[in-house]
Amino acid sequence: LAELMAGFTAQGMSEDEAKAKAEAASPLMQEAREMLVKWEAGDPEVRGLWEMMNNWVYAGFDETYKKMGVSFDKIYYESNTYLEGKEKVMEGLEKGFFFKKEDGSVWADLTAEGLDHKLLLRGDGTSVYMTQDIGTAKLRFADYPIDKMIYVVGNEQNYHFQVLSILLDKLGFEWGKSLVHFSYGMVELPEGKMKSREGTVVDADDLMEEMISTAKETSQELGKLDGLTQEEADDIARIVGLGALKYFILKVDARKNMTFNPKESIDFNGNTGPFIQYTYARIQSVLRKAAESGIVIPEQIPAGIELSEKEEGLIQMVADFAAVVKQAGEDYSPSIIANYTYDLVKEYNQFYHDFSILREENEAVKVFRIALSANVAKVVRLGMGLLGIEVPSRM
């Protein structure tokens, strides 16, 4: 199929035109298209096979998402939205927004926008991805009173979403201009790119298991699991392993390609998830010891306490959290929260090293530093939570 497409593209055809020609000339693709026609017509046998295979896939997805701590408010299946898309395409055809070729296929002429012709319906009447995305977008805006829709999809689909926005606008949907394609870069391993076609793709479940295993091994070597039960140790390994994976990826501007290094991500020093998690656990240890000593943090710290430059800096960093979250939202950049959280714990660790907390003789200063520690921990927990990363109460 790829060779056929390359040949047709060399003849000056657009990518969609070359793909359509290649599919028509490929026996295997012809069989697949025949099945698609039967599927859209509701053929019982084809629908039965499709449902069985989809259930296998959904079960696997659910297992992976659960392990990652990911959930969705609502899932839109293309099989439930393609009819909406076909209806809108036919409306666009009737209004002259689109045109039909001799083979019956429906296309959009986007040359005025500096693009090429885009296939919307095949000659046999079956839908394509663009048709389905038109239908899905329409349903989403109908179901929810949203101002903006963000598609989190790799940068390989930049053209697709540029076209989708234009088509929706042509069809009269004002919100078509408000579609945002959050175009993220690709993740590579030290050995090279992950490509499914070349068999170098890394299974998400295998990667998570590897990260958890590495986290457990590293934590044991550093004595961070000492005194814990087996169940507690396993839970810490899970939290640290998945936290390392998520943080290492999220700390990089998502628009850039990156190399994921499993060993580097587990390091308990530097800009890593485990370093932040360990600092949070350290603060929780301080708070537990303070509580055991009968120290109660007042709702308001008494005025008149002389603060060091380091303490004033920490207070300002904690106060900056809301602005950081706002900026991250405006820029569609979780990395802003990730790196802010790292900078905060780095400053706290320096404070922890340079100043007495529980051993401070001045009672008012001691209570202030404990309260400051508690507020740093709160912000760390909230920041990591926004990144989908758990923080352990002990380590």
Q: Where in the sequence are the language-model features?
A:
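NTP-dependent nucleotidyl-transfer catalytic core
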Residues: 1-395
